[in-house]
């Protein structure tokens, strides 16, 4: 009997082990399948900071027309989420930065957020990611940053309470979360955020099988020093390579360098297998005169090559993680004319507000790169050298110009001195002329303090001198 019992026990243990191994393999297979599915659907960022943008209904139809597979919202807009229930699009929603502290403080508040922003729409609306905040570590917001992971954890708790397990929670970070990123193997997170934020964040993401979301823009890395990095290398079309001296890994584009620097930074903190997702990447189609390389051809080239790379089957991954599926969101659907900052901030879109393309792009990645209509060659791929002025845009509203004129002249005794009666720029006496001088003078005087030639859309830069023999407009020399 004892021999028989031992025999039966052995069979039971063996079969149990086999079943456990089979279940584990099945779980791993389903995880991999989900990762491949998410990565195969190239997404689009749908921002709405513009006064000329179409309705959510029209915008979602435009998203379907470009064959995007996933849409990322910068909020949880009820109208958009309702409309998206009638599509096959995967959806990502965002918790605004200002709500993070409240969510972190109380599970009830997080439960209410989920009850309001997810439960009425899910699963008919195929929500796949909830992103808590946006680039929260790029701002000097210590209290908010330490509340980041607790807020994420409470949202996951609420999702689990409702039996929802396939919505992943993450947070998009920018490249400035790194202290060093070159060469890629030198990637290291900033010391002041490593202990308080990064380690808890990575532990949370790893424990929930979520992704490290990254807003990564090779344009800014390249444009800061365009003479040191080939434009073709930044646009995925160069034959040049870079070899990391520490690892021997060979890089053929700038994006892979930047992604691997983050992967190496996570490895140094003990997370070598963390999933990676690109929450924003793109290239501006226009910018200020000193924003070299911001043009339609470069934007089209970058995004077409990006989609080709990221939609490849099997996945290409990066030199340090070959074969890694990376869910990717192109930035962005429209130009957003109410964004502040330099000109490029308002010009990342692929569509005009009427839905017509700024340039053609195929989000399935199936169109060969030679299959698109030719685009005009740019003239700003090398830095501009010369004088620049700031003048009102054609058709600028006179009432708004007058208000901005008063603001500019109030900032300094010298800004508008030449506009005093009898002075060299007093005539002709008109709001447009006086505003032209005042805005330009103010911009030239304070440009080194990050004043932009924008003034809520009233002004733009020009290389044509707006002054005359009597009235000399101050200029900025690039």
Swiss-Prot record:
Pfam families per the UniProt record, alphabetical: Glyco_hydro_17 (PF00332), X8 (PF07983)
GO biological process: carbohydrate metabolic process; defense response; embryo development ending in seed dormancy; pollen exine formation
Keywords: Disulfide bond, Glycosidase, Hydrolase, Plant defense, Signal
Domain of life, source organism: Eukaryota
Disulfide-bond pairs as recorded: 390-453
InterPro entries: Glyco_hydro_17, Glyco_hydro_17_plant, Glycoside_hydrolase_SF, X8
Tissue expression from the record: Anthers.
The protein's Enzyme Commission number: 3.2.1.39
Active site per database record: 135, 280
A GO MF label: glucan endo-1,3-beta-D-glucosidase activity
Mutant phenotype after disruption: Embryonic lethality due to division arrested at one-cell zygotic stage.
Post-translational modification: Contains two additional disulfide bonds, but it is unclear if they are between the pairs Cys-409-Cys-416 and Cys-425-Cys-471 or between the pairs Cys-409-Cys-471 and Cys-416-Cys-425.
Keyword Calcium: no
Signal peptide (UniProt feature, chain positions): 1-20
Catalyzed reaction equations: Hydrolysis of (1->3)-beta-D-glucosidic linkages in (1->3)-beta-D-glucans
Family, per entry: Belongs to the glycosyl hydrolase 17 family.
General function of this protein: Probable beta-1,3-glucanase that may be involved in the degradation of callose walls around the microspore tetrad during pollen development. May be required for pollen exine formation.
Matching PANTHER family: GLUCAN ENDO-1,3-BETA-GLUCOSIDASE BG1-RELATED-RELATED
Protein name (database record): Probable glucan endo-1,3-beta-glucosidase A6
Lineage of the organism: Eukaryota, Viridiplantae, Streptophyta, Embryophyta, Tracheophyta
């Amino acid at each position: 009997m004892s021999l028989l019992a031992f025999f039966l026990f052995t069979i039971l243990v063996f079969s149990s082990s086999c079943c456990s191994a089979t279940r584990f393999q099945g779980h791993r297979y389903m995880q991999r399948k989900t990762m491949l599915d998410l990565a195969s659907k190239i997404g689009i960022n749908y921002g709405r900071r513009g006064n000329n943008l179409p309705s959510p209904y029209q915008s979602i139809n435009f998203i379907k027309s470009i064959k995007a597979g996933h849409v990322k919202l910068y909020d949880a807009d009820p109208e958009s989420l309702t409309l998206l229930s009638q599509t096959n699009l995967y959806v990502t929603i965002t918790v605004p930065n200002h709500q993070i502290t409240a969510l972190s403080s109380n599970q009830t508040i997080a439960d209410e957020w989920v009850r309001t922003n997810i439960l009425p729409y899910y699963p008919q609306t195929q929500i796949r990611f909830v992103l808590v905040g946006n680039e929260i570590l790029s701002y000097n917001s210590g209290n908010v940053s330490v509340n980041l992971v607790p807020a994420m954890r409470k949202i996951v708790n609420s999702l689990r309470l409702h039996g929802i397990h396939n919505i992943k929670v993450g947070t998009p970070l920018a490249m400035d979360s790194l202290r060093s990123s070159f060469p890629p193997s030198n990637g290291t997170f900033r010391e002041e955020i490593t202990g308080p934020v990064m380690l808890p964040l990575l532990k949370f993401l790893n424990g929930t099988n979520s992704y490290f979301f990254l807003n990564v823009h090779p344009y800014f890395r390249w444009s800061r020093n365009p003479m040191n990095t080939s434009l073709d290398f930044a646009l995925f079309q160069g034959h040049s390579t870079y070899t990391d001296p520490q690892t021997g890994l060979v890089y053929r584009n700038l994006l892979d360098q930047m992604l691997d620097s983050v992967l190496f930074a996570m490895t140094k903190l003990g997370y070598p297998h963390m999933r990676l997702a690109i929450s924003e990447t793109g290239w501006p189609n226009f910018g200020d005169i000193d924003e070299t390389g911001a043009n339609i051809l470069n934007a089209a080239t970058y995004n077409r090559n990006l989609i080709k790379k990221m939609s490849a089957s099997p996945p290409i991954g990066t030199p340090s993680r070959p074969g890694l599926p990376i869910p990717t969101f192109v930035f962005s659907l429209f130009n957003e004319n109410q964004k502040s900052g330099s000109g490029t901030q308002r010009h990342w879109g692929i569509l005009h507000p009427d839905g017509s393309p700024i340039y053609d792009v195929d989000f399935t990645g199936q169109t060969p790169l030679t299959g698109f209509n030719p685009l005009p060659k740019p003239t700003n791929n090398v830095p501009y050298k010369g004088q620049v002025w700031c003048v009102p845009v054609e058709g600028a509203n006179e009432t708004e110009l007058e208000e901005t004129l008063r603001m500019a002249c109030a900032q300094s005794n010298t800004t508008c001195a030449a506009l005093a009666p009898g002075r060299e720029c007093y005539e002709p006496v008109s709001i447009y002329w006086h505003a032209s001088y005042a805005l330009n003078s103010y911009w030239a005087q304070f440009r080194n303090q990050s004043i932009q030639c924008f003034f809520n859309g009233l002004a733009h830069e020009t290389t044509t001198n707006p002054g005359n023999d009597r009235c000399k407009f101050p200029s900025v020399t690039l």
